[in-house]
Amino acid sequence: MPINIRRATINDIICMQNANLHNLPENYMMKYYMYHILSWPEASFVATTTTLDCEDSDEQDENDKLELTLDGTNDGRTIKLDPTYLAPGEKLVGYVLVKMNDDPDQQNEPPNGHITSLSVMRTYRRMGIAENLMRQALFALREVHQAEYVSLHVRQSNRAALHLYRDTLAFEVLSIEKSYYQDGEDAYAMKKVLKLEELQISNFTHRRLKENEEKLEDDLESDLLEDIIKQGVNDIIV
C-alpha cells in the first residue's frame, strides 16, 4: 500500500494527538503540538495513506469520534468525525514530533534537536514507516537547523523502539534515567551525532533497492535449486 511521508502542518495536529493518545502513555496538550509545528515547521513529519483497506482494531470506536453540532439547522443535528482522517480519503498512520533544544540552561551547548514523540498506528507497523519518519526528521534537523546531534528518551521495556534507535538508526545509549516516566519506569537517554553526508535520503533508497535485488537473487537461486532437486527426483523415479 502506498505511504506518503511529508512535513507536518497545523492542519495535522488533531490527528497527531489522536495517534499519540491511541498508542502511547506519554501524552501532550494540543498547544504543545502547535508549539513544535509553529517554531520548527520543517522538523516534524507525518505518514499518510489513501489506501484504506487495512482496517481492524485500530479503527476508532463510535464513542471515540469527535461530535460536531451543526449550527443553523432546524433539528440541531450532530455529525461524528473520525480523528484518524486528515481529509476525506486521507488517513494519518504515523508521525514524528521534533524540536530543537530550547532549554535556557543549555544555551552553551551546540545546536541540537530532540525527538519528542514517534508513533505509528498498530495496523501499519513493521512496514518501515517509523524508520522513514525518523530519517526524514534527522535529515531536516541537520540540513535546516544545523543540529550537531539529536537526543531522545525511550522506555527500557520498549524493545522494538530500542532496536530501531540503537540498531537501525545508530543512536548510542548515554545513560539510564531512573523513574523518568510518570509510572516510575526508567528510560534510556540516547544520542546520535548528525552528519549530513550520512543522512542523505538517497543513501537509504539505494540500500533498499540493493536489499530488494539481493532478496530477488536469493529467491531465484532457491527456485532454481528446487527445480534441480525435483528434476533429480524425477530422473531417479524414471
Curated annotation (Swiss-Prot):
User: PROSITE patterns from the entry?
Assistant: GNAT (PS51186)
Provide any one GO MF term from the record: identical protein binding
Q: Which reaction does it catalyse?
A: N-terminal glycyl-[protein] + acetyl-CoA = N-terminal N(alpha)-acetylglycyl-[protein] + CoA + H(+); N-terminal L-alanyl-[protein] + acetyl-CoA = N-terminal N(alpha)-acetyl-L-alanyl-[protein] + CoA + H(+); N-terminal L-seryl-[protein] + acetyl-CoA = N-terminal N(alpha)-acetyl-L-seryl-[protein] + CoA + H(+); N-terminal L-valyl-[protein] + acetyl-CoA = N-terminal N(alpha)-acetyl-L-valyl-[protein] + CoA + H(+)
Top-level class of the enzyme under EC nomenclature: transferase
- Give the EC number(s) listed in the UniProt record: 2.3.1.255
Its keywords, alphabetically, are: Acyltransferase, Cytoplasm, Transferase
The entry's family comment says:
Belongs to the acetyltransferase family. ARD1 subfamily.
The record's note on quaternary structure and interaction partners says:
Component of the N-terminal acetyltransferase A (NatA) complex, which is composed of ARD1, NAT1 and NAT5. Can self-associate.
Q: What is this protein called?
A: N-terminal acetyltransferase A complex catalytic subunit ARD1
